[in-house]
Amino acid sequence: TTATDFCLRHNQLMADTVAVAPDRLVGLAALPMQELPAACEELERAVGTLGLKGAMIGTDIPQGFACQSLDPFYQKLTDLDVPLFIHASSTDGVSGLKDDRLNLHNFSLSLGYAQEETLAVAQLLLGGVLDRHPALDICISHGGGTAAFLAEKIDQLAQVDPTASEGVKQNGFGHELQKLWFDTHVKGEVAATALRHYAHA
């Protein structure tokens, strides 16, 4: 398919670029998440043959990150012992996540990205992904959106949610945040302090 062909070319180019300065660069694989068997196959090739160090995908996963259809993908990441980096997808309609309210004032970047990242964190933790795959390493872009700021509210509601994961119910959402990784590309000390309060970043 087009997606698979693109990822094959992207990953080869990524490996070629890393090879120019392997002591300074590492590369992450792009994966055709529209077709999970192909994504798993390309992940194995990218890591085992091309020497890439993990994978990077967007938040535009229609079934959500907690869907058990993704479990073979998570297991493949664990088997290969490589991390997954999740970056916010655009909310301007390019990836199908169109929200016209975000068209003004760069809201797609300031609010849309944060919304996508927060949803990803919440789905992963409340949906029990790390209960099912405790050795899985996932890093979320931009400090995980607003997850650290909203941790107590999410935890409060999780305690009365019969579908919330056992990990969150037993340990609390804030504690479970420590099972994820976050980059520190956040703006300002207030955001950085909230992130440091809960998570290793």
Task: Set out the residue ranges of the language-model regions.
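Active-site gating/metal-coordination segments in enzymes
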Residues: 1-123, 127-128
